[in-house]
Amino acid sequence: MALLMPRPSEQTPWVQRRGQCGTWGPEYAQLHDDVLSGRTREQYLVVEGIEGLADSLSLIAGMLYVAVLSGRALQIRENVPYSVAYDKPNIDWRETSKSRTMTEQHFTLRTGGPLPFDEPAFRLIYNGSIEELGAGADIVTMFGNVGVINVLFNNPVYKVQLYKMGLRPETAYGCALEYLFTPSLSVKEHFRDEIITMTGSSMKIGIQVRLGDSYLRGGVFEEQKHADASLLAVQHFFECAEQLQAAFRQPGQNVVWLLISDSLDIRSLSKTEYGDKLLVKLDEPSHVAGMTGHEQNQAMIAAAGEHWLFGLADYHVISSIGGFGRSAALRAQTWNTVYKLDVYQTNLLQCDGLKMKPLTWDDIANTAPFV
């Protein structure tokens, strides 16, 4: 039977989670404040994520540790409105204006396939020295969609430092997101009922059905939108949830399922089928990067809220494609709780938690867009 790692209360301040996330947080917050206030040399690591929210969060989470290890203040370039969806519990990560006399170097960590070993920044993080990243420049700007946490934990030097900081590969991603972000008031208001349910004592199973960006409003391939999605084609995701429920539910425990999907049809059909047992928003899913203005703000609130809620689940049934479900599940800081299924591959219906092997950290982290 899969073992759950004890999860700290969502209301517990990060500084009190030292048994799970280490003790480095307050010290880095002081360094960050010293840099921003000019009390120490101004050295910044500015991060600009691309593609979808999950890709960007993967880059941002890894770059937090690069900033910690190199003594730079992390800042996030808001090419999408992070501040609309997230508050800043420990450091103010918003990008600030810089003096024109400051030196700057730009790097790219971008991929749509294998890890970008040919990128200079990746090579330094993988088996070199982070201190050489930027070669003393005041500002290092990192642009991309690739996470480097797993890479850092494979670097013979930095993995030792990360372990001494109290971090582990299985928890580092979730710890980074919790350090940087808490849901904004707008997110909490939009998902008020869902938050109450997902922070209760019920057994919570998250289900992510990803069909592709063509189903998203504002998605890259929206003009190629497929025919209406059929619930029958993805029924094995819900059968998997039923099997996990049968295997791990405690006697008398209530069960709730949380569904996130890029298909409005799947959301609507599933709600009709499963009723009150299923938590699901019936707003049309939108691609954050494909929207502008007020519509982009609303898309960001929806995406960030569902990503955060999914991390509250005890077990996660995710699609094999894309990074949204995987990265949201990693926020939970648990292991042996993530089960991957292929969309439309209905001949593989077994998801019995006692028989089917859950994903390991490496399974999750070493699949594009990586963590």
Task: Pin down the residues of each PLM region.
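Secretory-pathway glycan-assembly enzymes, especially type II membrane glycosyltransferases
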Residues: 3-235, 241-242, 246-255
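Short hydrophobic/aromatic-enriched beta-strand-loop microsegments
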Residues: 276-284, 336-343
